[in-house]
């Protein structure tokens, strides 16, 4: 399950990192309203990253709608003031290193 962002449109796909595949196979739906996106994913409070599980692939950084995640050397940094707690990073992480808690 993958969220891709193009401007203000979120494309939800079932296959990891396969935007061309999603567009070709029509295995996605679009969410244009970020408030609706928050309703779909739930309102969340904190983002915890398990640095021992994280492979630093950058998948979470690429899908963050607010750019709150940054890959700095060998760490993922979360800007809590920018993060909207949507939980998309949690859902995209291929190794389950991110946990967004209520």
Swiss-Prot record:
Residues annotated as binding [4Fe-4S] cluster 2: 64, 83, 86, 89
Pathway(s) the chain acts in: Membrane lipid metabolism; glycerophospholipid metabolism
Required cofactor(s): [4Fe-4S] cluster
GO molecular function: 4 iron, 4 sulfur cluster binding; metal ion binding; oxidoreductase activity
Binding residue positions for [4Fe-4S] cluster 1: 54, 57, 60, 93
Record InterPro entries: 4Fe4S_Fe-S-bd (IPR017896), 4Fe4S_Fe_S_CS (IPR017900), Fe-S_Ferredoxin (IPR050572)
Pfam families reported for this sequence: Fer4
Entry keywords, A to Z: 4Fe-4S, Electron transport, Iron, Iron-sulfur, Metal-binding, Repeat, Transport
Claim: Repeat is one of the keywords in the record: yes
Top-rank lineage group of the source organism: Archaea
Cofactor note: Binds 2 [4Fe-4S] clusters.
Protein task: Ferredoxin that is the specific electron donor for the geranylgeranyl reductase GGR involved in the biosynthesis of archaeal membrane lipids.
Miscellaneous comment as given in the Swiss-Prot or TrEMBL entry: This ferredoxin is encoded just downstream from the GGR gene in the genome of M.acetivorans.
Entry protein name: Ferredoxin
Organism: Methanosarcina acetivorans (strain ATCC 35395 / DSM 2834 / JCM 12185 / C2A)
């Amino acid at each position: 399950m993958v969220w891709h962002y193009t401007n203000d449109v979120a494309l939800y796909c079932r296959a990891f990192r396969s935007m061309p595949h999603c567009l070709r196979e029509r295995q996605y739906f679009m969410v244009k309203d970020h408030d609706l996106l928050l309703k779909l994913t739930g309102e969340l409070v904190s983002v915890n990253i398990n640095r021992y599980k994280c492979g630093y692939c950058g998948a979470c950084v690429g899908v963050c709608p607010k750019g709150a995640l940054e890959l700095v050397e060998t760490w993922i940094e979360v800007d809590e003031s920018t993060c909207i707690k949507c939980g998309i990073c949690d859902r995209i992480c291929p190794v389950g290193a991110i946990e967004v808690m209520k």
